[in-house]
Amino acid sequence: MKLYQKKSYSLIVLLFSSFLLISCKNKLKKPNNQERINRLISYVKNKEGFNYKIIDTIKYKGANLYRIKMSSGEWMSDKVKGESNWQHWLDIAIPDYIDTNKSLLFIGPGSKYDDEIYLESLSIEKAIKTKSIVSHISNIPYQPIKFISNDTIDRYEDDLIAYGWNKFLNGGANDEDAEWLLRFPMTRAVVRAMDVVQEISSTKSKPVNSFFISGASKRGWTTWTTAAVDKRVIGMAPLVIDLLNIVPSFEHHYRLYGDWSPAVEDYVNYSIMDWMNTKEFKKLLSYVEPYEFKSLFTMPKLVINGTIDEFFATDSWKFYWNEIPEKKYLQYVPNGNHGLLGSYQNQNIFSFYERLIYSKDLPELEWSIENGSFNIKVEKNIPHTVGLWKINNPKSRDFRIWEVGRNWEKKEIGTSDSGIYKIDVPKGDGYTASLVEIVFYPDSDSPLTLTTGTSISPDKYDHQPYQSSLK
């Protein structure tokens, strides 16, 4: 912009230019992702239909477990058969001695027919050890659900989610249809669970005021969306939802396998993949895709994935990791499929959680994969071990469990006083997958395991891109 040189005009010109600039910006303003996330925020704030009741109190040595039946709200009452008010079991472990206002909430699966306690004994033990309240909400999403329109099928999990996506996309991706996206009521249910935990703890010595949340698979996705809409979330551990930046991630998926994995069959059945790169699909993602509002995730994050996942390629991290804000920590579980390996990941979550709530330093770890090497820098003077994990598939670039089994192998790497490591990316016949694992405080009762992303060598495709059937 050319500036006027006459001093007498400069202030007037500056003010007038600023006014024009602001006016133009307002006129040109278009719906953006902040407006879409605001719709989700508004949705979860609605407490219509919300209520809860304490059903039982179970005494453990060192803690009480509250069993609560919670209704999180109505969903599609004019379109579903039977109960449209989502029902959940919320189990809350309250230790006899509480030393923090922070709390851990697990987001779990289940069905409306279940009534067992999902909060495992390890969680109760950790509540006592960390002197913090630990809870678990089940039946996320509420399921099964039948729909009125000639539906005789009990819909669960991905079939239920894909059904709603299909309705939204084929209906023109209108704003008023956003509730079809099941992440809306799933996120609302978790927010209501936090409300209940706060109310139950309000009479305790340290009432809960913030949460660390964790869930797996579609509950992992809901972990992200809950963190985006509720400021009470001060940390999170989403598990096995290795698909942020979903379009390039799934384009990658197809070029690796030449087909869609059976694990995503429900989405294939509704032709969801054909909608990728359409304006309708972009609209869908703007509502519920964490990558679309990634700037909101400034809280500490421990992202846990499996290396032999049935749903996601083991190097999917590269489509989102570098763009996610700090502080962020990654763990790929060697030989971990979509269900991971039992307590392996939970122990790591508790280690991370304990360090976070008591303001213990989280280890500094920098890593990159460049020029055929893992380049790693570990903070000095922190006890740690280093290992290189690898697996080979001589036939194809496919590391799903049914192709390679649980055959990742580990090689110990000697520790360096400098904390700096340069480790060659392994190669072999066909394709080789590898990662570097660093275990911090290995001799303590709460070690913390972190890894680099997975590297695949050679980095090339065997198949052509997916061709949508939509015209």
PLM-predicted stretches and their roles:
Residues 29-99:
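Catalytic-loop region of hydrolases
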Residues 89, 101-110:
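Short beta-strand element of the alpha/beta-hydrolase
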Residues 111-112, 134-191, 243-256:
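Cap/lid segment of the alpha/beta-hydrolase catalytic domain
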Residues 117-135:
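Short amphipathic alpha-helix adjacent to the substrate-entry channel of hydrolases
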Residues 172-188, 192-217, 233:
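Gly/Ser-rich "nucleophile elbow"/oxyanion-hole loop immediately N-terminal to the catalytic nucleophile
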Residues 225-274, 331-334, 340-344:
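Hydrolase active-site cap/lid region
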Residues 280-334, 378-386:
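Serine-hydrolase catalytic core
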Residues 351-390, 409-418:
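Surface beta-strand/loop "capping" patches
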